[in-house]
């Protein structure tokens, strides 16, 4: 039986920052290989990752671009030697992602004739300010106009057949380099996957498919009024320790951006016995009065 792989990459984090990602994978019954590429990370952190059952690959940053984009260089250089070793590959952001189930189960049942799966953020590009402006800035208005009616796809969760994921990471690195915006990977991902042949190779997973959810658009309370009128599906909900799709009541395989919801963050802090620091849900001192509405 072919093996599957979950692989991540991060820079400048300590172990606590990635512990929820690591622990959730270990608790998901995933039976494949687990790899973390680490940059500017202490020996102690690398040791703890190794002790948790992950292969650790320390790398040195080239220091010329944001890690959002640089990670794809390291992912490609690892995967290009493994194209025939793995069946499915899943690569995600590390700091704000947890797995609720083994991704192998969903992929084996749902990928079918497709080579890749991309997770929808349940909103059209033209209705989400950051993605709209980011795509225009990086790729111009003509390409933006070509894809603006499509839903936003999240580059923080990439999965599919090994060769397809490998070559996609190479394309994302090249398309993200030397762009006008300092974060260009999401724009590159949304442009690329709407073009041939990627548009034929990629399954777009909606919330009702229970593959992955991205909480920043759907569930961040401070932006309910901004995004609410434009959501293409109902907001996911939290029940019995799991984030679920409203329509099907099925738990998602992957939860992304859980730190945008204070109650979810608090739950995962207790579950994984770690302090989760987030700019989106900072600690609130009850003795300090604030007019801020984004906490």
Identify the residue ranges that each predicted region occupies.
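Juxtamembrane luminal stem/stalk of type II transmembrane Golgi/ER carbohydrate-processing enzymes
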Residues: 1-6, 263, 270-295
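N-terminal anchoring/stem segment of glycosyltransferases
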Residues: 1-87, 163, 291-295
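Short acidic, S/G/P-rich loop/turn micro-motifs used as interaction or catalytic elements
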Residues: 12-16, 97, 262
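Short coil/turn segments at secondary-structure boundaries
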Residues: 19-22, 48-50, 61, 103-105, ...
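Preference for well-ordered, secondary-structure-rich cores of eukaryotic proteins
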Residues: 28, 32-35, 112, 188-190, ...
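GT-A fold catalytic core of metal-dependent nucleotide-sugar glycosyltransferases
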Residues: 74-131, 166
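Short, flexible, basic/aromatic active-site loop/helix in glycosyltransferases
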Residues: 133-149
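Catalytic core and acceptor-binding pocket of nucleotide-sugar-dependent glycosyltransferases
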Residues: 147-267
């Amino acid at each position: 039986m072919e093996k599957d792989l979950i692989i991540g990459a991060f820079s400048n984090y300590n172990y606590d920052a990635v512990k929820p990602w690591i622990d959730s994978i270990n608790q998901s019954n995933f039976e494949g290989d687990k790899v973390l590429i680490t940059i500017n990370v202490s020996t102690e952190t690398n040791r703890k990752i190794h002790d948790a059952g992950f292969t650790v690959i320390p790398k040195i940053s080239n220091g010329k671009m944001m890690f959002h984009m640089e990670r794809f260089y390291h992912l490609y250089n690892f995967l290009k030697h493994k194209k025939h070793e793995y069946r499915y590959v899943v690569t995600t952001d590390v700091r704000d992602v947890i797995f609720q189930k083994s991704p192998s189960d969903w992929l084996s049942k749902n990928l079918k004739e497709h080579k890749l799966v991309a997770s929808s953020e349940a909103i059209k590009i033209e209705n989400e300010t950051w993605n709209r402006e980011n795509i225009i800035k990086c790729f111009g208005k003509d390409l933006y106009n070509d894809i603006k009616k499509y839903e936003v796809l999240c580059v923080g969760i990439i999965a599919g057949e090994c060769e397809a994921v490998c070559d996609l990471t190479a394309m994302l690195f090249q398309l993200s380099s030397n762009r006008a915006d300092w974060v260009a990977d999401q724009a590159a991902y949304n442009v690329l996957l709407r073009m041939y042949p990627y548009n034929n190779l990629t399954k777009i997973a909606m919330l009702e498919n229970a593959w992955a959810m991205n909480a920043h658009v759907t569930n961040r309370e401070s932006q309910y009024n901004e995004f609410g009128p434009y959501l293409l599906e109902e907001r996911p909900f939290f029940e019995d320790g799991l984030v679920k799709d409203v329509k099907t009541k099925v738990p998602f395989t992957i939860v992304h951006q859980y730190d945008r919801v204070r109650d979810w963050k608090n739950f995962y802090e207790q579950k994984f016995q770690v302090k989760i620091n987030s700019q989106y849900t900072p600690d609130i001192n009850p003795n300090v009065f604030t007019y801020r509405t984004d906490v």
